[in-house]
């Protein structure tokens, strides 16, 4: 993966570097200068930090690199796009509309009326909306004022509560099915169309509440009014009609509700005190790190309706994790779970996916009404937790975590018509009545349900009632059938009869349940033997409880009938008889029972593993603690109940014995859980401090400073931050907590639990007091509060705060936790105070004081005067405030406050209000108190505050890269942006117009919206959008608007969307304008078509079209990329649309074009981009040649040329899409077919009346020649495209005769005119006979060795011609089933006559014919490919390929066909079919001599392999041989390549020291690569003239880029290595050779590409022979210099050796030196000794001479073996390998790292293999081996083309495709056997020692004989092994063992003198270089400066390297 990423980076860099090669881009590049300057600055660290200065940033935006002013339009556009990108990122990565303000399950709308109460009366606030109605639960009833019934009976005085009277009940997975979904959607549409209107509709669907029912809602604080998403919201729509008589007990209406506030206030204080203590004491974080812990499969079969009880789910997860977790992990989890059971209000842990689930009926109104007045002393901390969490937001939180949880929809069906009554019970025994009422309400709830799971859950809840001494069975009679229902608690039967009588009995259902259980356990056998005992104990207790403690239902019925009457029971029976029948089906019972047993089994397993969890459980059912009531334990059977609990695992302890945490106390009896005596496994391991810190008092009415309380220790600790110096501050702190949370209740009542869950999930861990981050002082300390770590006033930091200031940061953080996201502190003080006024309008004194205390303070301390004024004005003593009696009585008990409350100095850490804001608040304070609001705000004050905040942002900008500074700056920036949006919303009226228009559009469209999009819209967000206009209109009114409508994040989101729409609206019309302008031009041009009726114009136009065929204009490639981007944008929008609509769309509906564009324009490299540069052509000749044609005809001709053939393009698209997407096409053939399908008849036009080759002239004056064959082929193509190929000259005509002679002599004898114009007749021309064939040849065979540029020549001709160019790949036609040859009649191909051809004369019919038959042909091809297993079908396909290509070529004639590597079509049994077809087509084309003009060019580098049938007079009858490029030809080639792309060479280029001195490789590919590099540099430098320095830079860049191809290492010592190489080159080589480029580096570069053997041999030959110019010693010194410099200059380190050996070039220097010495010995030692070296005596170095001649074969063998590194061949590696200590992967990696870059196999005579025939014909079958992997059985096919390589990994070790090329012995995870190794021919008489031995390589002996012997007849046997494995499937170890063994033998045979010679040479070289570097002290600095100046090194690299 790392290598792939590296390759991608390298390719991207090349693309970006050469992307400027398009000349159109040169103009647009100037527009990017400002962006380029910014990019340039980003790479300089010191400049980058300066960007944070706004002045510098503004200058950069206004200037470009040249210092001139930049394009303002471009700058503005760039800034707009940048802002758009930032907004998109912000929307995606931040909750712009906070999720806490949205309903988490908002798939359906919650009925919330848009109208707000005009008055502040309580009655009007109740019915307005859910939120308003629920918000009154904290309000205080005015003294002596009751709720009037008139309000409920008069609809005109109320606001409508829109309810849904028809609802379906189904799980979420079934929402999209059935009629119930239609009902929901219908209700949803009705809701959307009526819920948000400003006025009540004419016929509103309003169900009003009776006063008693309203009181029922008020009295039950845990009841929420929500119609969806919870099965516990059963009472939602049980409202009665106004006309019905109420049966409510009206005496409850007169009771005030002050007890709610009183009890709540005290418990809030208790809870918050403990929370603040935990914040200081413990580091609060989540335990769970296992993602499996938090995730539950959505359709887990074990997750049934039981797990709606969160404890069930918890036990299930415990049971699962017990198999994997260690004992310590289970201990930690159990400890936390113990706390969760004992103090759940303090534990919210997402790891358990558990929170306290407050039942809707858990704290009924009657209990509060009766018990709260008495202020009983035995209430525990959690008693009022249902008040805190009254809105059951845990439902939302729990549903998000447990994905399986089924969301239920409360259902009602015409309740008003059935005239139901709300049942309210008033009984002295409150709990009994509550349970009875819950039973009846549950029965009513399921009246229309038909879902078994829903009813099952309902009965679960019913039997989990809070009565442990009672179990019910309810028998209903109304039918003769009775079916048992199994529940985990009891067995219930329902018998329904017609007489509607009641009979209630208890059954012995436990026996049947136990029988099933025993049967189940017996089947499990041994697995449950241990657990069976636990089962028996539980069922015994269950039987005792069910048989002895039964309370007959008849008694319960009597009690209820006294208060309710018989009508309710009749209604219940009627409903049950209609709705419960589905539940009693046998299938449902079976499913229910199976689920029950599965759960029981898991629970018993959980208990058996010593995980005794301290929770209340009954039988085998654990019961959630919030659903447990112990109020009846004082009855006569309490002893039995206690025994039951103790037997299950709980110990009942009285309070007098211990003081543990209270579970719940309603009466005088105390029921407590002891957390430390039940399980010895856990009792001693739970820290005592946990229970001590969480213990609470038994009497909550006492003050907080009680000494015997555990909590009192927290507040009386002097070293504790919660204990301020003065008691006054303590009360102030307590008050701040209360006030903050009070405001929380008032603003977001239903989200407080979600915040607690989010903020306080913790595991117990002692926090560390850190003294770091003291830079920002108080700011950091305050900020760290949110990370739940305190360091305030701890240790030495105590001096930061004085006595008064100690409490201020704490109070401010209390406010910051709960206030800022609700009361956004912005400059819009009018908006803030308006919100506060809403709260002040309510009769709540404490809230008023909290607002003054928190809001009216600022970041700066108040003066004494200000404090006095505020206290006198707002903070009056309690006695001076008109408190109600109940509040006056209760207030001192729960809050120790006096008249001096004290003003908190609040530092809003995320706002930092300025002093102006503070004074502004003070000024507005009086108006707030009096109820007056200012409706306008001064413009200057708003923007001045905004500017001050912006200045504050600039001040802290340098601290952006610190974590604290980043958070702070983010807050400031978000605040500024939000404030700016709010200011603009009041200044710009267009936004309101947009809102109004959007509102009207949405009103119309919403009713027509598809069903599936409505289910995806979040209801609250939609509600906010629709109400936005109404909100702005009532912005200054006093109304209870939901706070999230006022939040700045919402408006930021809203205006961001508007901004993005404006940007999109700008881009869209721009392109629409372009389209409209093009359309208008088209209309103008169409008018000229009328002139086509004139015959003269028609004739002229036909002439023009014949001479100048219409062509496609060159399109800018960036335009195509833009089209791709637009298509991708369209695709993404369709995907988003499909996702939003619930469709399964994966891609676009028409994704063909995107596929084509991606393939065509994104898979491009630098060379392809350069090839896109158009050629410079003049159009003057066109005007000259068409001067006699009328203007009208020219205009029509231009119109036709511009016209795009829509039909033809459609055909191309259809063909190409079918080829690209059809699965029936093989991958090998896909590229070939795509090429054919993309061909069109319209090509680029060149002026054919002029000479098309402008490059044959030699304007430079320097000798540049072309090869004769290239000249002939170029003129032949020119004649062909001028339609002269089939022209029959009339030799009797003198004019035609002269023309023909001129052309013939020019073509035939052009090779004699070197350096002259090719049209000049040579004076020494040979006589010419007119009897020869007058027409030129149509078949050309181009031969030449690899590297001569055959493919480049043909492609060059194709580029300069305007006729179609078709490539035919012969290897695609090879028949892989030769046994079918006899079944195919080749003569059938002769039946193809002219009628099958496509007539090109009538171009208009071509498209029609293709269009008509295209679908049939494509269908036929698909069908044919699907039946390829058929023999005849395979033969037909083989025939189709060759036929299709030639038929297309004939249809598109004149065209050129190129067949590379035609020698593959040899005469043999496997490809005779394709060869015969090819010969047949060539013969037919030649014999016809029809107007079909096809020029066939074939190329090969092995002419001996070409079949004689192809070389015939009427086939490939002309042979052109290309030789290696000479120096003048290289220059010509370079000149041509550069000139065709619009670049020229400077005049002094051809001087002696200029271009002539630069040596380019003889390979054509080298010249092309160099040309591309030069052009990329020229375009970057904006030069059109190429100079010598540019070419040298390109050469050096190619050499220097070596370091990017070697794998990257962290060792920067390679810089010294590079400098050392440069020093040695500059000192030793450049002065002698005048060659500034290191030849060894060029050799390495060429070796990496393996460019050719002769080229390599040339270098070695120069080393051995040209002693006057270069010596081997200099090269040895140059290769060694890098390592020596690295050793001398680099600092020693622990990994010094690793640093040296980790770099490829450093390691290969040694291999290169050794190879040079071996080569020198092979060339010099074999030919001469000391005495016969007279030719080189003067310059010869005696050090390198041999005392005696050596065997050249031994020297060559040793030289080729130098590829193996000495470190790898050491005895250590051998021993490690033999012992198995060295992994094969390590050996393979070492081989790759240290072998690839070495001169792997040197073959001095390898270049001769081209010239002499290869009798074995290795080149043919070597293709079968290419890419064959020995280690992996995988085939790597390559195209037979000169430009293809074999690449391996990122090293790009490339191997040329040729018979005797150098193939590397090693590749990444591959071994390539080189059959063309010249050593095969050298060592024919003995086993080849340099390569693998035959027996160890081949799997078949016969195969090895056929490959390794010189018997030509054995070639035929090769095809038998075509599909067999060539190599032995050996393991890696055997290969490495063989290599080591072979190298050991070679090393043993080598002479000792050679090894000593190496040592002496290298040691002397090292000594010489050391002295050189040490003596030249300034040399390092000079070379460093030179490298920096040449930009070969960069300062950052030097800084890293020299530090």
From Swiss-Prot:
Keywords: ATP-binding, Nucleotide-binding, Plastid. One of its GO terms (cellular component) is plastid stroma. It comes from the Eukaryota. Gene3D superfamilies: P-loop containing nucleotide triphosphate hydrolases. CDD domains: RecA-like_Ycf2. Transmembrane segments: none annotated. It is found in: Plastid stroma. ATP binds at residues 1344-1351. Probable ATPase of unknown function. Its presence in a non-photosynthetic plant (Epifagus virginiana) and experiments in tobacco indicate that it has an essential function which is probably not related to photosynthesis. Belongs to the Ycf2 family. This is Protein Ycf2. It comes from Cuscuta reflexa (Southern Asian dodder). The gene is ycf2.
């Amino acid at each position: 993966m790392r290598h792939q990423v590296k390759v991608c980076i390298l390719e991207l860099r090349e693309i970006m570097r050469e992307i400027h090669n398009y000349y159109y881009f040169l103009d647009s590049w100037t527009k990017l200068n400002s962006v380029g300057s910014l990019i340039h600055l980003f790479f300089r660290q010191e400049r980058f930090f300066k960007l944070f200065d706004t002045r510098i940033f503004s200058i950069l935006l206004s200037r470009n690199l040249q210092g001139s002013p930049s394009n303002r339009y471009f700058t503005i556009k760039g800034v707009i796009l940048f802002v758009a990108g930032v907004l998109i990122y912000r929307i995606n990565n931040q909750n712009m509309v906070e999720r806490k303000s949205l309903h988490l399950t908002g798939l359906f709308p919650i009925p919330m009326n848009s109208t707000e109460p005009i008055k502040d009366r309580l009655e009007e606030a109740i019915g307005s909306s859910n939120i308003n109605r629920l918000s009154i639960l904290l309000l205080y009833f005015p003294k002596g004022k009751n709720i009037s019934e008139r309000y409920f009976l008069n609809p005109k005085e109320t606001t409508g509560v829109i309810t849904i009277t028809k609802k379906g009940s189904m799980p979420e997975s079934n929402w999209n099915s059935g009629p119930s979904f239609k009902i929901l959607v219908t209700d949803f549409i009705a809701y959307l169309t009526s819920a948000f209107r400003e006025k009540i509709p004419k016929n509103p669907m309003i169900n009003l509440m009776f006063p008693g029912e309203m009181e029922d809602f008020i009295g039950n604080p845990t009841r929420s009014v929500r119609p969806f998403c919870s099965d516990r919201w059963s009472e939602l729509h049980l409202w009665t009609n106004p006309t019905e008589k109420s049966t409510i007990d009206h005496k409850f209406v007169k009771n005030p509700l002050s007890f709610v506030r009183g009890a709540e206030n005290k418990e809030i204080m208790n809870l918050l005190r403990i929370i603040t203590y935990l914040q200081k004491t413990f580091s609060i974080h989540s335990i769970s790190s296992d993602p499996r812990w938090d995730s539950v499969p959505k359709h887990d079969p074990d997750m049934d309706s039981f797990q709606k009880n969160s404890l069930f789910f918890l036990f299930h997860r415990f049971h699962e994790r017990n198999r994997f977790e260690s004992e310590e992990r289970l201990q930690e989890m159990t400890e936390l779970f113990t706390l969760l059971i004992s103090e759940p209000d303090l534990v919210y842990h997402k790891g358990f996916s558990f929170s306290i689930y407050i039942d809707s009926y858990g704290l009924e109104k009657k209990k509060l009404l009766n018990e709260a007045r008495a202020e009983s002393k035995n209430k525990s901390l959690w008693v009022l937790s249902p008040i805190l969490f009254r809105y059951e937001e845990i439902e939302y939180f729990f549903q998000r975590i447990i994905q399986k949880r089924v969301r239920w929809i409360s259902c009602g069906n015409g309740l008003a018509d059935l005239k139901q009554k709300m049942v309210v019970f008033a009984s002295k025994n409150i709990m009994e009545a509550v349970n009875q009422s819950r039973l009846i309400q549950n029965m009513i709830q399921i009246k229309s349900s038909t879902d078994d799971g829903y009813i099952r859950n309902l009965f679960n809840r019913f039997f989990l009632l809070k009565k442990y001494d009672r179990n019910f069975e309810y028998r209903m009679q109304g039918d003769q059938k009775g079916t048992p229902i199994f529940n985990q608690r009891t067995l219930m039967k329902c018998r329904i009869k017609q007489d509607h009588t009641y009979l209630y009995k208890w059954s012995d259902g436990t026996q049947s349940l136990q029988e099933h259980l025993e049967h189940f356990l017996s089947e499990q056998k041994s697995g449950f033997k241990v657990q069976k005992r636990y089962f028996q104990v539980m069922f015994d207790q269950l039987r005792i409880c069910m048989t002895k403690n039964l309370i007959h239902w008849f008694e319960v019925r009597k009690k209820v009938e006294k208060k309710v009457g018989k009508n309710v029971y009749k209604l219940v029976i009627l409903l049950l008889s209609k709705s419960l029948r589905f539940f009693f089906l046998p299938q449902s019972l079976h499913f229910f029972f199976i689920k029950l047993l599965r759960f029981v089994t898991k629970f018993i397993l959980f208990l058996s593993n010593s995980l005794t969890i301290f929770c209340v459980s009954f039988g085998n059912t654990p019961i959630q603690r919030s659903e447990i009531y112990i109020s009846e334990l004082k009855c006569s059977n309490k002893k039995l109940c206690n025994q039951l609990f103790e037997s299950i695992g709980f110990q009942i302890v009285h309070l007098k014995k211990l003081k543990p945490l209270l579970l719940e106390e309603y009466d005088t009896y105390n029921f407590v859980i002891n957390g430390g005596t039940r399980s010895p496994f856990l009792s001693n391991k739970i820290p005592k401090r946990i229970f001590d810190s969480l213990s609470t008092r038994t009497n909550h009415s006492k003050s907080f400073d009680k000494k015997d309380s555990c909590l009192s220790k927290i507040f009386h600790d002097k070293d504790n931050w919660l204990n301020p110096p003065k008691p006054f501050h303590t009360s102030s702190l307590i008050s701040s907590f209360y006030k903050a949370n009070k405001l929380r209740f008032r603003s977001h009542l239903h989200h407080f639990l979600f915040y607690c869950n989010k903020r306080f999930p913790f595991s117990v861990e002692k926090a560390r007091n850190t003294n770091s981050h003291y830079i920002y002082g108080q700011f950091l300390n305050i900020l760290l509060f949110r990370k739940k770590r305190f360091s305030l006033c701890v240790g030495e930091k105590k001096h930061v705060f004085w006595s008064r200031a100690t409490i201020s940061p704490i109070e401010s953080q209390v406010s910051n936790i709960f206030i800022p996201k609700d009361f956004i502190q912005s400059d819009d003080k009018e908006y803030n105070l308006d919100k506060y006024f809403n709260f002040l309008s309510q009769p709540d004194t404490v809230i008023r004081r909290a607002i003054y205390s928190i809001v009216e303070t600022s970041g700066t301390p108040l003066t004494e005067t200000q404090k006095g004024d505020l206290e006198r004005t707002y903070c009056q003593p309690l006695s001076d405030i008109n408190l109600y009696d109940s509040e006056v009585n209760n207030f001192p008990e729960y809050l120790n406050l006096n008249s001096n409350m004290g003003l908190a100095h609040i530092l809003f850490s995320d706002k930092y209000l300025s002093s102006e804001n503070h004074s502004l608040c003070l000024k507005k304070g009086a108006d707030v108190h009096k109820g007056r609001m200012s409706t306008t705000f001064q413009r200057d004050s708003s923007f001045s505050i905004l500017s001050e905040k912006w200045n504050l942002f600039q001040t802290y900008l340098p601290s952006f890269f610190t974590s604290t500074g980043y958070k702070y700056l983010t807050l400031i920036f978000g605040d500024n942006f939000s404030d700016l949006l709010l200011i603009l919303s009041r200044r710009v009226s267009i936004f309101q117009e947009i809102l109004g228009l959007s509102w009207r559009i949405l009103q119309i469209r919403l009713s027509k919206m598809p069903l599936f999009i409505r289910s995806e819209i979040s209801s609250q967000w939609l509600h906010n959008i629709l109400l936005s206009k109404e909100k702005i209109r009532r912005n200054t009114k006093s109304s209870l608007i939901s706070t999230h409508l006022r939040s700045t994040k919402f408006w930021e989101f809203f205006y961001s969307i508007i901004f993005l729409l404006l940007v999109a609206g700008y881009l869209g019309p721009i392109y629409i304008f372009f389209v409209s302008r093009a359309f208008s031009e088209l209309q103008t041009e169409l008018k000229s078509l009328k002139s086509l009726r004139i015959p003269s114009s028609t004739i002229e136009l036909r002439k023009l079209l014949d001479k100048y065929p219409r062509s496609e204009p060159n399109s800018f490639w960036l335009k195509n990329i833009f089209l791709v981007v637009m298509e991708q944008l369209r695709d993404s929008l369709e995907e988003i649309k499909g996702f939003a609509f619930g469709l399964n769309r994966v891609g676009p509906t028409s994704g063909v074009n995107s596929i084509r564009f991606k393939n065509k324009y994104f898979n491009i490299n630098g060379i392809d981009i350069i090839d896109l540069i158009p050629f410079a052509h003049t159009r003057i000749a066109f005007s000259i040649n068409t001067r006699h044609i009328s203007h009208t005809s020219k205009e029509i001709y231009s119109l036709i040329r511009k016209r795009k053939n829509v039909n033809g393009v459609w055909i191309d698209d259809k063909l190409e899409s079918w080829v690209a997407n059809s699965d029936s096409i093989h991958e090998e053939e896909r590229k070939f077919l795509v090429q054919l399908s993309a061909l069109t008849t319209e090509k680029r036009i060149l002026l054919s009346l002029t000479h098309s080759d402008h490059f044959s002239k030699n304007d430079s004056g320097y000798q540049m020649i072309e090869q004769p064959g290239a000249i002939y082929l170029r003129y032949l193509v020119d004649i062909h495209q001028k339609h002269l190929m089939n022209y029959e000259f009339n030799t009797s005509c003198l004019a035609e005769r002269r023309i023909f002679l001129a052309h013939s002599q020019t073509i035939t004898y052009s090779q004699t005119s070197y350096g002259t114009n090719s049209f000049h007749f040579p004076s020494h021309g040979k006589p010419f006979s007119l009897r020869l064939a007058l027409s030129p040849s149509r078949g050309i065979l181009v031969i030449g060795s690899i590297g001569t540029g055959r493919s480049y020549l043909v492609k060059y001709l194709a580029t300069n011609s305007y006729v179609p160019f078709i490539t035919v790949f012969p290897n695609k036609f090879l028949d892989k089933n030769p046994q079918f040859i006899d079944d195919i009649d080749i003569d059938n191909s002769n039946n193809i006559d002219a009628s099958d051809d496509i007539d090109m004369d009538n171009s208009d019919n071509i498209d029609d014919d293709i269009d008509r038959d295209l679908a049939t042909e494509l269908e036929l091809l698909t069908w044919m490919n699907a039946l390829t297993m058929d023999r005849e079908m395979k033969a037909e396909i083989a025939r189709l390929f060759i036929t299709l290509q030639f038929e297309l070529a004939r249809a598109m004639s004149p065209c050129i066909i190129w067949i590379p590597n035609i020698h593959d079509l040899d005469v043999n049994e496997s490809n005779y079919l394709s060869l015969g077809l090819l010969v047949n087509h060539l013969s037919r084309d030649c014999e016809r001599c029809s107007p079909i003009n096809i020029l066939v060019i074939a190329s090969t580098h092995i002419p001996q392999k070409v079949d004689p049938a192809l070389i015939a007079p009427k086939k490939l009858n002309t042979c052109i041989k290309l030789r290696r490029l000479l120096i003048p030809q290289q220059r010509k080639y370079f000149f041509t390549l550069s000139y065709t792309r619009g670049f020229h060479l400077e005049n002094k280029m051809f001087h002696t020291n200029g271009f002539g001195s630069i040596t380019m490789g003889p390979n054509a590919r080298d010249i092309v690569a160099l040309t591309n590099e030069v052009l990329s540099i020229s375009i970057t430098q904006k030069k059109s003239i190429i100079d010598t320095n540019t070419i040298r830079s390109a050469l050096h860049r190619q050499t220097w880029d070596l370091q990017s191809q070697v794998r990257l290492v962290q060792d920067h010592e390679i810089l010294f290595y590079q400098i050392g190489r440069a020093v040695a080159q500059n000192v030793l080589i450049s002065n002698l050779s005048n060659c500034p480029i290191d030849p060894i580096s060029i050799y390495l570069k060429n070796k990496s590409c393996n460019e050719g053997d002769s080229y390599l041999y040339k270098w070695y030959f120069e080393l051995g022979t040209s002693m006057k110019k270069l010596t081997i010693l200099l090269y040895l010194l140059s290769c060694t210099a890098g390592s020596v410099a690295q050793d001398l200059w680099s600092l020693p380190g622990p990994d010094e050796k690793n640093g040296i050996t980790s770099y490829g070039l450093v390691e290969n220097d040694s291999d290169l030196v050794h190879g040079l010495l071996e080569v020198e010995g092979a060339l010099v030692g074999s030919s001469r000794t000391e005495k016969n070296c007279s030719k080189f005596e003067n310059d010869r170095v005696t050090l390198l001479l041999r005392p005696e001649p050596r065997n050249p074969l031994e020297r060559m063998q040793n030289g080729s073996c130098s590829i193996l590194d000495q470190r790898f061949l050491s005895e250590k590696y051998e021993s490690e390998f033999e012992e198995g200590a060295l992994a094969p992967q390590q050996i393979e990696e070492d081989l790759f790292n240290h072998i690839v870059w070495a001169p792997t196999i040197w073959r001095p005579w390898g270049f001769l293999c081209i010239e002499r025939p290869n009798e074995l014909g290795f080149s043919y079958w070597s293709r079968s081996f290419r890419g064959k992997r020995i280690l992996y059985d995988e085939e790597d096919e390559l195209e037979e083309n000169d430009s293809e390589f074999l690449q391996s990994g990122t090293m790009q070790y490339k191997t040329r495709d040729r018979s005797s090329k150098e193939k590397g012995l090693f590749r990444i995870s591959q071994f390539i056997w080189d059959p063309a190794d010249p050593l095969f021919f050298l060592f024919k008489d003995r086993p080849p020692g340099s390569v693998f031995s035959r027996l160890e390589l081949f799997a078949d002996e016969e195969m090895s004989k056929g490959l390794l012997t010189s018997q030509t007849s054995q070639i035929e046997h090769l095809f038998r092994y075509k599909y067999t494995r060539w190599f032995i499937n050996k393991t890696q170890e055997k290969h490495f063992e063989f290599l080591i063994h072979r190298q050991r033998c070679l090393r043993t045979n080598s002479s000792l003198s050679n090894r000593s010679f190496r040592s002496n040479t290298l040691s002397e070289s090292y000594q010489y270089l050391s002295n050189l570097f040490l003596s030249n002290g300034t040399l390092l600095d000079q070379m460093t400066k030179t490298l920096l100046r040449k930009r070969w090194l960069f300062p950052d690299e030097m800084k890293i390297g020299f530090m």
